[in-house]
Curated annotation (Swiss-Prot):
HAMAP family: Adenylate_kinase_Adk. GO terms for cellular component: cytoplasm. GO terms for biological process: AMP salvage. Catalyzes the reversible transfer of the terminal phosphate group between ATP and AMP. Plays an important role in cellular energy homeostasis and in adenine nucleotide metabolism. Pathway: Purine metabolism; AMP biosynthesis via salvage pathway; AMP from ADP: step 1/1. Pfam families: ADK (PF00406), ADK_lid (PF05191). Residues 30-59 are annotated as: NMP. ATP binds at G10, A11, G12, K13, G14, T15, R123, T132, Y133, G203. Keywords: ATP-binding, Cytoplasm, Kinase, Nucleotide biosynthesis, Nucleotide-binding, Transferase. AMP binds at T31, R36, G57, L58, V59, G85, F86, P87, R88, Q92, R156, R167. This is Adenylate kinase.
Length: 217
């Protein structure tokens, strides 16, 4: 199973990715992990990436695609792989297609923006213990304080509504077009095109997992 998981920040991709990878015995590949591993291993592509990063630049799509091709030839990808957060843009998707990277499925987890904002902006945490709460879905016994210590809970900057809205705007502008790109390619009937499936990301984790498994076939 070679697949791409698409969805906005906070759509629950991480939870589903972990489940799919365990079930199929495939690695979850993110560009960040891939870059770090290649730099550490000192591969040709890794050294090229390090040079750019050390200079404070953005690693080019050419280098990223080179790393992808290198990574999916490794033994742990024999049964497939799951791309998490990649490709991010149409040029990356086009470059992957041109490089002949074979895909079986593009799976989109669809959650309305307002539901994501509610989901993320409602998170609260107790920094010392790592305990997490949600003002609506998993509230503490006493509003604003940790159940165990009685210490105040905090809202991470990443979870503030304004930040969440900005991240969603970036997703809509950059990554959302990939949904149209892959669904249009699948509709052409091209033998090289991956299947495209969309599942609803609202409900319990178990319900969403069941939908994901049905889509994976």
């Amino acid at each position: 199973m070679r697949l791409i998981l698409l969805g906005a920040p906070g759509a629950g991709k991480g939870t589903q990715a972990a489940f799919i990878c365990r079930k199929y015995g495939i690695p979850q590949i993110s560009t960040g992990d891939m870059l770090r591993a290649a730099v550490k291993a000192g591969t040709e592509m890794g050294l090229a990436a390090k040079k750019v990063m050390d200079a404070g630049g953005l690693v080019s799509d050419d280098i990223i695609i080179g790393l992808v091709k290198e990574r999916i030839l490794q033994d742990d990808c024999a049964n497939g792989f799951l791309f998490d957060g990649f490709p991010r843009t149409i040029p990356q998707a086009e470059a992957m297609k041109a490089a002949g990277v074979k895909l079986d499925l593009v799976l989109e987890i669809d959650v309305p923006s307002e539901a994501i904002i509610e989901r993320m902006s409602g998170r609260r945490s107790h920094p010392a213990s790592g305990r997490t709460y949600h003002v609506k879905f998993n509230p503490p016994k006493v509003d604003g304080v940790d159940d165990v210590t009685g210490e105040p809970l905090v809202q991470r900057d990443d979870d503030k509504e304004e930040t969440v809205r900005k991240r969603l705007e970036v997703y809509q502008a950059q990554t959302r077009p990939l949904v149209d790109y892959y669904s249009a390619w699948a509709a052409t009937g091209d033998a090289a095109a991956p299947r495209y499936a969309k599942i609803e990301g609202l409900g319990t984790v178990e319900e969403i997992t069941a939908r994901a498994l049905a889509a994976l076939g």
